[in-house]
């Protein structure tokens, strides 16, 4: 609770972070990202032009740029000790779900359970992404999917557990997109090329037209 109270003070004047969202103090939130009401962000980072829908929870997750995350998603679920006497976090975490603090320092390494969400990722409503999963750039996670393993760049996955349905583009186009890394280009460059982002079924020729200077 202390982390959330400090987070409230830290992000109080971020106009795109809802007053009714809970964000821990140690989270890193871009001023150009948006967190909607009743969402929870715990020890996570969110980069520019990404948004988190209402009632979505992020735990130990890093979210890239231009990501669209719908409502009621669970990303990076809390982990529990399976090989100890007890699975309760009261024995291993200073701040935990019980609201009681029995120890002065965490005894488990949370960093190994981080979820990595790439850039330009779309995550549908009610999707769940388990801990220690990496979602590649440009991927799409279908509504209600439960993602238990890594998702490749530009893959479309759905189902329980989530499986690859298809890829958004041809291998040639995907490789070119990964070379360009358009999400790292300056805003003025993207605005100059906005017509290309409004076109369906892009080709290598279209991508080669992107003005990067």
Where are these regions (language model features)?
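Catalytic-loop signature of eukaryotic-like protein kinases
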Residues: 120, 138, 155
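Glycine-centered loop/turn positions within well-structured domains
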Residues: 83, 149, 153-155, 163
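Conserved catalytic-core motifs of eukaryotic protein kinase domains, centered on the activation segment
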Residues: 79-81, 151, 167-169
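Beta-rich strand-turn-strand
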Residues: 127-139, 145-148
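Conserved G/P- and acidic residue-centered "switch" motifs that form tight phosphate/ATP-binding loops
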Residues: 141, 159
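Membrane-proximal basic amphipathic "stem/tether" segments
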Residues: 1-30
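Flexible, glycine/small-residue-enriched loop-and-beta-strand segment within the central core
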Residues: 34, 41-133
